[in-house]
Amino acid sequence: MDAPPPTKPPRGVKYGKDESAGCGFLVNVIKSLGFSETTEERQKEKQKIEAEFKRSDLRLNELVSRHDQQLTQVLPLFSQVSSEVTASRERIHAVKENLGVCKRLLQCRRDELRKMWMDAVQHKYVLEMLEQIQELRKVPQRVVGYTAKRQYLHASKALTDALTTLNGPLQAVEGLSDLRTDLQTRRQQLYQRLHEELVTQVYTNSANEALSSFQRTNSSRLNSSFTRGIGARRSTDRIEANARVRKALAEMAQSFDLDKAEVIEDADLIYPELSMSYFVAIIVESFGMLHKVPDSLETLRVQIQTELLNVVRHTTHQLSVSGATADTNPLLSLLEVIFKQFKAIAKTHSLLLKNYLSVGQKYSVVGPQPYDLTDFWAQAQSVLQLLLTDYLDIQNAAADESAQTGFSEPTSNINSYFLRRKVPSTKRSMFKFDKSSHVGTSNNSDAFKEHRRNASDASVDDNLAGQLGGSGKGSTSGLFPHEKKQREKILICTPDQSIITKVYLPLMGYIKEIENFMKCKPGQPCSLHDFLDNYIKDTFLTKGHNRNLQLTIESLSKNQDAWRTIISPEEIKALNLSRPLLQSTVMVERRLMETKNLIQDLPCYSEDLLKMVCALLKAYREICQAAYRGIVQPDSEDKRIYSVAWLKDEDISRFLKTLPNWTDLKTYSQKSRHNRKLHRGSFEPSEEESPLQVQQRNIREAEMLTSNLGEGGITQQEILVEISVLKELAILQESMEWFSCRVSEFANDLRRPLVNGLNAVPAECGADIAVKDGTIKVMTNLALEFDELANTCLLVLHLEVRVQCFHYLRSKSSVRTNSYVGSKDDILEPDRQVQVLTKRLSEMDEAFSATLHPRKTRYIFEGLAHLASRILIQASNYLEHIDQITVQRMCRNAIALQQTLSNITASREVALDQARHFYELLCMEPDEILNALLERGTQFSEMQLLNALQLSCKSFGITDANLLASYQQKLSDILGAKPSKGVVV
């Protein structure tokens, strides 16, 4: 055996179900033999199979011979192991038989011992306490009977007398321990039953009474456990029943013999108030008999919060199922009902405390003093805070707080509910338990949602149950087993922080009543008031509304495309607008309207909200001004836009704002603001100017702009070439004007009393409700600044159109002099610069018509014909000589501009006829010019006519100075002026 143990040979190849192994091979052989048609084929198949078998036999012999030594070792070992296994089985069988014999012997001995012990105990009990036990054993049955009839005073007296006997003369008797324990257990059970009945009276019935007034029917009250049997009874029966109940209450208030007292049946308890008073008195009297007054007081005080939570949960469920709040705000209705229920419960607590005081004096109870209604309302505020925590979604916004590890009073349990909740993970869950038997059914409706609070709620409920279970002597941890479960909460609507805006004013009314109940001193608000104030300031405003305002400004300041993105056509229609606005402006206006609604909903925080609004508007003002500078200011600082530079000139700006067309436009804008709802989409024209006044105004403007134009002209870099830039400026103007109007309306609304649509502002907000005049003034000034920016944009557009006329129609003399002579352009077409100008004017009109109000487009293009006419006439100053082709080209220029401007303004621009008539004069001889002036009258200035005479003389080769002087003298005589000095402009 010194040789190493044999090793298991490697496992051979496992053949599959193919032709060379197992049954598959045999089947194939049978098939091949079956399909063979001749004996020769079968013989060949046989030989083939025999050859295969020979090869297999040879391989088997080879393997056996190769592993002969190992096989020789394995076979003896196998025989040895087999024999040892057989011997072990025989030994185990013998042990099993021996164990069976021992078991039977022990069973026989145990029965004998048990029988002897039971006989001895029974004999002892029978000899010592048979008669006493027989009497005491009747007590449990009597207690059960009294309890079934709800005669709690009789049951309490029977238990108290029996326990007094057991703890007195029979205290040393050990055989009565079971009976004593049973009676103590029954006393505890009766105490639990009485406590449940008291809770039902104080909380359930009081709450149902308040709930029934809200619901359509009083079925819940009719089905109440203590108000059964309110059937149709005669008035005399009702009077007699009420008299018996009042008599019983009067007897209980004094010392009375229970055996002689009249038993009041449930059928006699007709009126809920008498029923409640009677049962409360009965239960408190029973507590006094059972010596449970201190325990019951402590349990009631500790359990106020839990029972109020149950009332809230039950009421929420009832309102959700009945659909009573379908047409109103569900949370408002819920709060209204709950507060009425709390007041009814507080009234019942007041009655309960009076009975406790009477019973405590009657039985000389020594223990803790009864709680008062201040304690109740403190717990009620905690429950309301829990309710608001659920609906305001505070767990997702509250800051991290450390959980309290211990507390002395259950009233401090409320702090555990305000721990930060874990934010739900966005990852998909790996497992689902929706098919598990432990998963409850869920209602997917929006109005009825139920879920469990997290582990912090469970810990609170466990601590509360521990407090209840540890109260009183002999109390067990299972006093209120339902308290061990996690508290389920039912929501009547989806949690949302914005709900505070709908419930704030009603809540403030409830808080005022609570502070009156608790007799809070001025400047010392109740805890619910502090909770609501802290939530609104620290969470709803700081982390909600104010944060949204800051994010809006940050997004606008970082987004470069915010000044190019306009609102959609659907938004234009929704806002009752006719022109597009910047999306950023509408976004800020929405934030403004949100704040306006918040001021109406939260009037006590109007100053805080207005401070944030002013900061928002100031930041947006800076952004808008920066956007305006980005539009009109080129990249290079040494460049300038001519129209912007003109507008910065105070004289030009003041002159434009004093013109009648500007004042008329602003007057119309102000009227349209006041009458937007009545005259939307139309306008009543103000007092129209006469044609002469319009002509004089346009001439004044053209003269002023011409006089301020430099000698060098206007280059391509000094104009806004891109139409898209002008369109952006127009949209900015329209947006700023609209936004200014909205801000002004908002400021004007602040002057009126802030009243919510549901309730007037509560008195406690009176000190803060008046918005300061300084704040309103700041808002008004901001509105004026936005309006001023809109005016600036409009004036820039007004001047830019005129600057481009100067740019395209007035070039340097070196460029314009005789530029038409030898030109390759079609002589029947206007000048190329004029063609470019007319095209740009049409493009600008198209852009402005799509972005500006028609009155503003009219203001931009009105008077442009007078300026163009003046520029065309002044262009003659740069002509060295005149010919027919030049005159025709200049006339076509005037006609082209006239057609374009007439299409834009929808009126024939007669001012350009003057330019055409001027160049027609240049084709005449000097005498003809003077005769034409005598016949038609003059419509040009003296300088223009002098220039025309000089060009005419050059054209006809007149160079005699005396003749030129005579023509000038004749012109002066015609004009009635002094002789000219011969200066040509």
Swiss-Prot record:
One of its GO terms (cellular component) is presynapse. Residues 434-480 are annotated as: Disordered. Component of the exocyst complex involved in the docking of exocytic vesicles with fusion sites on the plasma membrane. Involved in regulation of synaptic microtubule formation, and also regulation of synaptic growth and glutamate receptor trafficking. Does not appear to be required for basal neurotransmission. Pfam families: L27, Sec8_N. Belongs to the SEC8 family. The modification Phosphoserine is found at S235, S456, S459, S682, S686. The exocyst complex is composed of Sec3/Exoc1, Sec5/Exoc2, Sec6/Exoc3, Sec8/Exoc4, Sec10/Exoc5, Sec15/Exoc6, exo70/Exoc7 and Exo84/Exoc8. Keywords: Coiled coil, Exocytosis, Phosphoprotein, Protein transport, Transport. Abundant in the embryonic and larval glutamatergic neuromuscular junctions (NMJs), pre and postsynaptically. Disruption phenotype: Flies exhibit defects in development of glutamatergic neuromuscular junctions (NMJs): increase in synaptic microtubule density. One of its GO terms (biological process) is protein transport. Residues 36-70 form a coiled coil. Transmembrane segments: none annotated. It comes from Drosophila melanogaster. This is Exocyst complex component 4.
